Amino acid sequence: MPRKHLIANQINKKQQSNAKLWQKLAKEIKAAVKVGGTDPETNYRLKAAIDKALTYNLSKDSINRNIYGNSNKEDDQLIEAEYEIYGPGGLGIIVRTLSDNPNRVISSLNGYISKLKGSLAKPNSVKINFQEQGIILTDLNNYHDEALLELLIDYELIDINSDEEGYEIITVPNAYYEVKKKLEAAGFKIHHSELKLIPLLYVQLTPEQNEMFERFSASCENDDDIQWIVANNQ
């Protein structure tokens, strides 16, 4: 199975059954509802949040409770922010936060950045090097490449990769849900799917730089105020 997009730099797969991860997924659902309402068909962000929550095994009951349940005072005060960071060796990092205490976020993040030997970047100076894409990993379903291309000919695709275990279909964001629906209708088993920011260019870090980034990443994963990070390291 092609794994380059699945494994890379967002929520770490080792946290798949971690309560902290589920807490962050639930928080994103609540934030999406606050902004756009409870209908995922008209709330693009909520639809993406539900899709991701299901991918990481958050139960449907928990999802529904976070959509329709009463919010508490802390939920109502959640503030979103996105920080762009320059790291060592040309590393570019985007950090998304969701917190009721922005001062705490800045204080914590400055500490992580200092240990990384990085610096805060101006808005869009890092993000310009990323592109949102829909990533769908499937089984082969007895399809060869040409047959799959014919099945998806009406949709805007970025790329299709395959190996002996399955396909990796990469779409533009607007085509993601329709492509996924088409694949499911054709009998494909979806192993993993999500919308995510993908680097347009990757950098190769030295072992020392990679160790610093791993510590930075672990700090972010363990921070309740940080929803996710992406970076352009290989």
Curated annotation (Swiss-Prot):
GO molecular function: DNA binding
Intracellular or extracellular location(s): Cytoplasm
Record has S-adenosyl-L-methionine as a keyword: no
SUPFAM superfamilies per the UniProt record, alphabetical: YebC-like (SSF75625)
HAMAP family named in the record: Transcrip_reg_TACO1
InterPro entries for the chain: Integrase-like_N (IPR017856), TACO1_YebC-like_2nd/3rd_dom (IPR048300), TACO1_YebC_N (IPR049083), Transcrip_reg_TACO1-like (IPR002876), Transcrip_reg_TACO1-like_dom3 (IPR026564), YebC-like (IPR029072)
Transmembrane segments: none
Family that this chain belongs to: Belongs to the TACO1 family.
Principal location listed in the UniProt entry: cytoplasm
Superkingdom of the source species: Bacteria
A Pfam family reported for this protein in Swiss-Prot or TrEMBL: TACO1_YebC_N
Gene Ontology, cellular component aspect: cytosol
Keywords attached to this entry: Cytoplasm, DNA-binding, Transcription, Transcription regulation
GO BP, one annotated term: regulation of DNA-templated transcription
Protein name (record): Probable transcriptional regulatory protein MYCGA1330
